[in-house]
Every structure is written in structure tokens, then in C-alpha cells.
């Protein structure tokens, strides 16, 4: 179990989820991931100005992962070239140009990340990308989750909501999320019923275990509430 910092109401949801898992026979180990604080460290993020008019952080610098921006352009270009049919869009620059030509339709939330990604070559050859990728794998995989699983003899790690997405996604490790409960407040703002999920993440090729764990918890907790819209 690892969840870092959480608001009190979200902690209460997690506490109930842990009780359910223990009732099912799970053995829970609460332990820190030693390199969790390395994620997003120097050399792994890029400064991008937030120009989204609907964002409370407009005008501030965002720090998206370097690897994400480089791989976004590379992956999207390959998809548009090899798989997209019925469209004139063949690369990211075409998408950016379309958005600029149709601002009311396409730029309601800006395209800061697309513009930042477009500044890269798109072939993953740059030193900045390769260096950031190596640091990500060292922090998230080699000295992170791999060491964590070995040291504590774990089958999976449990994260609240998407709190584990940053570290599990970097080495490409699988995760599955199921409903855990609801809270009435998010970042100090009241919400009617804001859903909180429970994420099960595991090492490479552990999808079969994760699906069994998540299904057993989902059936026992019965926290899924279909949307009413």
C-alpha cells in the first residue's frame, strides 16, 4: 500500500477499502516507495506556459514530463501516418494548424502541450529525451518499483485514485482501477459526490493477477454507482 499525501476524507475512503481487502484475506504492507520523490525531478520535465483561459493556473508554468511530450509527437505522427483513415491529418503539425484555423471549435482549452511537443523532432533521437527516459526508468523501475516489489515480496501495489499513475506508467507496468467510494470535497471545493478509485498496479506481465484482485474487491465492496446523466 502506498498513497503519499491525501485529504482526510479520501483517507477515510482508503481505510474502508483496506478493511475490505483484509476481510478478503489480503496481507497489506504499508511502506514508502524509496524513489517516489524523484519523479518529476530535474532533467525530466519541460516548462510550458499555461494559456488555457478556463484554467485557474492560466499564465503559470506547467511542468509536463519531457518523455511524454517527445513520445506524444512521435506516437501521434506514426498513428496518423499508418492508421488514420478518412482524414487529411498526417502529422501533429496538421492538427495544430487545424486547431489554429478553427479556434472556437478546437481551442476552448488551448493546445499548450501540442505546441510544446511540436518543437521536438518527432523521432526520439534528441539527447534531452534519451537522458530523461533513462532517469525515469532509474527512478520508477530499477530503483523504484522493481526494488519495492523485491524488498517487500509484493504481488501488487495499491494506490488511491490515479496517485500511482506517474510512477507505474513510466516503466510501462499494468494498472487497473475500480470504484472505492465518494467524497464531498476536492481541493477545498465542495462536490456533490466525487468518485475515488482504488488502483491495483503490478510488475510486468501481472495483468492476470491484477484483474483477479480488482474483481474480488469490486464484488465485495459494491461501490460502483452508475452515472445518472
Describe every region a protein language model picked out:
Residues 4-14, 63-66:
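Active-site pocket-shaping loop/turn-to-helix segments
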Amino acid at each position: 500500500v502506498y498513497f503519499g499525501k491525501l485529504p482526510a476524507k479520501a483517507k477515510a475512503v482508503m481505510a474502508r477499502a483496506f478493511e475490505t481487502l483484509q476481510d478478503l484475506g489480503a496481507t497489506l504492507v504499508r511502506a514508502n516507495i524509496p524513489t517516489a520523490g524523484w519523479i518529476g525531478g530535474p532533467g525530466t520535465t519541460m516548462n510550458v506556459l499555461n494559456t488555457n483561459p478556463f484554467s485557474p493556473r492560466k499564465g503559470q508554468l506547467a511542468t509536463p514530463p519531457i518523455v511524454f511530450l517527445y513520445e506524444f509527437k512521435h506516437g501521434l505522427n506514426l498513428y496518423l501516418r499508418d492508421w488514420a483513415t478518412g482524414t487529411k491529418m498526417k502529422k501533429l503539425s496538421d492538427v495544430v494548424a487545424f486547431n489554429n484555423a478553427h479556434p472556437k471549435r478546437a481551442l476552448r482549452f488551448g493546445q499548450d502541450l501540442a505546441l510544446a511537443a511540436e518543437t521536438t523532432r518527432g523521432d526520439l533521437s534528441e539527447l534531452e529525451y534519451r537522458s530523461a527516459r533513462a532517469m525515469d526508468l532509474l527512478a520508477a523501475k530499477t530503483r523504484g518499483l522493481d526494488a519495492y516489489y523485491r524488498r517487500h515480496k509484493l504481488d501488487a501495489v495499491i494506490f488511491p485514485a490515479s496517485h500511482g499513475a506517474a510512477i507505474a506508467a513510466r516503466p510501462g507496468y499494468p494498472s487497473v482501477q475500480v470504484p472505492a467510494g465518494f467524497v464531498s470535497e476536492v481541493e477545498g471545493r465542495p462536490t456533490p459526490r466525487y468518485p475515488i478509485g482504488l488502483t491495483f498496479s503490478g510488475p510486468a506481465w501481472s495483468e492476470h493477477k491484477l484483474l483477479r484482485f480488482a474483481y474480488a474487491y469490486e464484488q465485495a465492496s459494491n461501490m460502483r454507482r452508475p452515472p445518472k446523466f
